[in-house]
A protein has these predicted regions:
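Interfacial/gating helices of multi-pass transporter permease domains
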Residues: 34-53, 119-124, 188-193
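Short alpha-helical transmembrane segments in multi-pass integral membrane proteins
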Residues: 1-13, 70-137, 168, 183-211
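Residue-level signal for short hydrophobic patches within transmembrane helices
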Residues: 6-25, 29, 51-58, 134, ...
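Helix-loop interface residues and adjacent transmembrane-helix termini in multi-pass membrane transporters
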Residues: 25-28, 36-39, 73-76, 151-152, ...
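Alpha-helical transmembrane segments of multi-pass membrane transporters/permeases
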Residues: 93, 148-175, 189-196
């Protein structure tokens, strides 16, 4: 019995541990590709990514709430109301990510300039965050669906989604940052573009699977 219990726990948690590592995977792969672009770009990328992740964590908190609520309703046999929970969470998440997006675009530039000692790094960081900010909408909605599937104990699909995001991000980084396969070389701005598109792909994958 113990052996079966441990195996069942591992079957659920192993994909979960890897699947919720999405933002780290995206950031690490971006960092590998931009590492050849110089110190200014590396500094702007690191600080810009930190600013983005700080805002993203607000959205992550709502996704954790969805996970708990869905698991509670599923365990209580109230599955009919789980759909309403998911829908309401997605609407609220849309407003939250929109608010964070507005704050980022209205105050982000002033904050970056005020905190940066180098004007070159500040400008590169501003260019980065203006593109990366759009990813908040996709990443936030993706996390809601991740929380939903975790609450139901269906973690394998989360792992598939994470792998899809990682593969897409690596491929798009290869295309956009250095301008391969006929694409223009976007440099630093290619990284946030690749990340945002990859997060959109991950969200659409889970949405289609849900439907």
């Amino acid at each position: 019995m113990q052996k079966y219990t441990y195996r069942a726990i591992l079957k659920i948690t192993a994909p979960l541990m890897l699947g919720t590592f999405v933002q780290s995977i995206v950031t690490i792969t971006d960092a590998v590709f931009v590492s050849e672009l110089g110190d200014i770009v590396i500094g702007a990328f690191g600080n810009g990514s930190l600013m983005y992740i700080s805002l993203f964590m607000f959205c992550r908190g709502l996704a954790d709430g969805v996970q708990i609520t869905v698991a509670n309703k599923d365990g209580a046999g109230a599955r009919a109301s789980i759909g309403d929970t998911l829908f309401n969470a997605q609407i609220f998440q849309l407003f939250l990510s929109g608010l964070l997006f507005a704050i980022l675009f209205i105050f982000g530039e002033a904050v970056i300039i005020g905190l940066s000692e180098s004007s070159d790094v500040a400008q590169a960081m501003i260019d980065f965050i203006k593109v990366r900010g759009w990813g908040l909408f996709f990443a936030a909605q993706h996390m809601i669906l991740v929380g939903f599937f975790i609450g139901l104990g269906r973690t394998n699909i989360i792992l598939v989604s994470a792998l899809l995001i990682a593969v897409c991000n690596i491929f798009l980084d290869y295309l956009f940052i250095h301008g391969n396969m006929g694409m223009p070389a976007l440099g630093l701005q290619g990284a946030p573009l690749a990340s945002s598109i990859s997060e959109l792909v991950g969200f659409l994958f889970l949405l289609i699977y849900l439907i």
